[in-house]
Curated annotation (Swiss-Prot):
Subcellular location: Host cytoplasm; Host nucleus
EC number: 3.1.-.-
Disulfide bonds: none
Pfam family, one: Flu_PA
Name this protein carries in UniProt: Polymerase acidic protein
Gene3D superfamilies hit by this protein: Influenza RNA-dependent RNA polymerase subunit PA, endonuclease domain
Cofactor: Mn(2+)
Keyword annotations of the record: Cap snatching, Endonuclease, Eukaryotic host gene expression shutoff by virus, Eukaryotic host transcription shutoff by virus, Host cytoplasm, Host gene expression shutoff by virus, Host nucleus, Host-virus interaction, Hydrolase, Inhibition of host RNA polymerase II by virus, Manganese, Metal-binding, Nuclease, Phosphoprotein
Family: Belongs to the influenza viruses PA family.
Primary role: Plays an essential role in viral RNA transcription and replication by forming the heterotrimeric polymerase complex together with PB1 and PB2 subunits. The complex transcribes viral mRNAs by using a unique mechanism called cap-snatching. It consists in the hijacking and cleavage of host capped pre-mRNAs. These short capped RNAs are then used as primers for viral mRNAs. The PB2 subunit is responsible for the binding of the 5' cap of cellular pre-mRNAs which are subsequently cleaved after 10-13 nucleotides by the PA subunit that carries the endonuclease activity.
Cofactor binding note: Binds 2 manganese ions per subunit.
Species per Swiss-Prot/TrEMBL record: Influenza A virus (strain A/Chicken/Hong Kong/220/1997 H5N1 genotype Gs/Gd)
GO cellular component terms given for this protein: host cell cytoplasm; host cell nucleus
Amino acid sequence: MEDFVRQCFNPMIVELAEKTMKEYGEDPKIETNKFAAICTHLEVCFMYSDFHFIDERGESIIVESGDPNALLKHRFEIIEGRDRAMAWTVVNSICNTTGVDKPKFLPDLYDYKENRFTEIGVTRREIHIYYLEKANKIKSEKTHIHIFSFTGEEMATKADYTLDEESRARIKTRLFTIRQEMASRGLWDSFRQSERGEETIEERFEITGTMRRLADQSLPPNFSSLENFRAYVDGFKPNGCIEGKLSQMSKEVNARIEPFLKTTPRPLRLPDGPPCSQRSKFLLMDALKLSIEDPSHEGEGIPLYDAIKCMKTFFGWREPNIIKPHEKGINPNYLMAWKQVLAELQDIENEDKIPKTKNMKKTSQLMWALGENMAPEKVDFEDCKDIDDLKQYHSDEPELRSLASWIQSEFNKACELTDSSWIELDEIGEDVAPIEHIASMRRNYFTAEVSHCRATEYIMKGVYINTALLNASCAAMDDFQLIPMISKCRTKEGRRKTNLYGFIIKGRSHLRNDTDVVNFVSMEFSLTDPRLEPHKWEKYCVLEIGEMLLRTAIGQVSRPMFLYVRTNGTSKIKMKWGMEMRRCLLQSLQQIESMIEAESSIKEKDMTKEFFENRSETWPIGESPKGVEEGSIGKVCRTLLAKSVFNSLYSSPQLEGFSAESRKLLLIVQALRDNLEPGTFDLEGLYGAIEECLINDPWVLLNASWFNSFLTHALR
């Protein structure tokens, strides 16, 4: 917990909390939960005060950034965090200048706008009970009380919340984040119970004598005995209070808080319709590579030279023909485009010196495939605003698609190991400062688990393609440049290998804005027969271009070689993120680290070595219709990496929406599993928000299917 506090909070807050504890003779290293609670309370007090000022007219305003010379006065005086002597000096000074009554206890803030002291509370318990305790302790109507909880609730004197909604939301979000971070490290239960005392020893003792009299004296008004008060608290149902608070906020709000039970949630409704189709920018499990080992040819490292060398390793080229047409496209154009690529590559070889780049001739088939002269003419709005029936371009609603089995197969394949290494040890990047031994050890273990993973191949392939396409888009804006799709790896024996997946031909690319689109035609080699899953290849025209001899257990067999051709498009911003796909390695490493941290905090020692080297232990990987799937730590690393990579490859507004909305339902279910007795209102509205993102995206549909499996097994 101490390490978490030092990582999670601003160093100034940590220092103040340490001083406060030492002032009261407490040790932050021993009373770690108290240390965390004090830091949290300090941060909430500072956030409460941040950005709130009083202008020259005495009006309260919010200024997040602006003129530092403006005549503004801070709305709140912060008392919390000062040493006791200084804090009382500030309180006395305020009382003398404003005439307000001096409080019995040190408050947290003074509000110059409302002319009152404010007591801020942060509780891990039931908010109403904590509020009663505060009010009973202060016994002053002059001090305003404002309580926040880690579950997003708040309570204030006379329902006067002082601050605007956004400022309060910022505080609630921060508290929720702290709770999530603690939970992910296995610290939350201990922290929560340290305040609640729900499982502490005193509850099992009979309270007698002086302590009993003191307990009876310190009850809130209208309670005759401790048992009486306990019975009220245990049977307390917050429904009416919450509804009352909501109705105070707005007359339009009419919410009934319903308890969320195991039987409450229903599965997400996945759409019906034709099966969803492949929409990634390049082939994944179906890709085929033409490779050269230990490349040492002239111009090695220049993409066009490498591509020609790879093409020469294959001798099974045949006259191409269409075997799966694209339903809406002019398929002969795709066929002629491939023939043009072959012819122009042959022309290059006949030249004395091979050029570093190749711009394709602007033939009719390429102009059609790249959408040349197809974009509607742009007209300035000023020139057409007087047109009576001017309206937005009408576009049809997207057609609903159902989940298809191929996307689960793609994901499974991405988690598998290949026989090549796709990243060097330092690919994740060295720390600038002298890196701790533990951190470097974790990185090395993680890299060893994922360096041969197919998802890592997709990362390097994505980085290469996006970098090459963005470079060409800027350097050769008007040209139809031929861009080889290349990756590099090392074999098991450590030999370097260069792979060619196919080619891209880039269209015109005058990209002024981040979202301006560049069209491209992709042509990718494959051994997958598209007729096996035609729905997956809806957007492609597939040609048969040759025969490949493959070594199998029964000897050499001949298999047809296919070329998957399609028109596609991307933008500057998408290419920028594609170039940064290595971030997926970092994201999944951080997720693994939080698992190690949780384990280490339980065992109270670093568990990195045991975590990676104890091969007998299995870990939960995910949910399937069969239940919770488990696997080795390596499998967990590769699964987390594959999820991160697929989030990048299949990023879309549907995924953004589904992730944000389904997370809310996930947190409610998690609260139920933690016995926190969650309540909800308008649950069907939340389901609606999730389900409107389930349209036709294969990755989103698969995640929704996984979510349903999770609901089934989580609530048994």
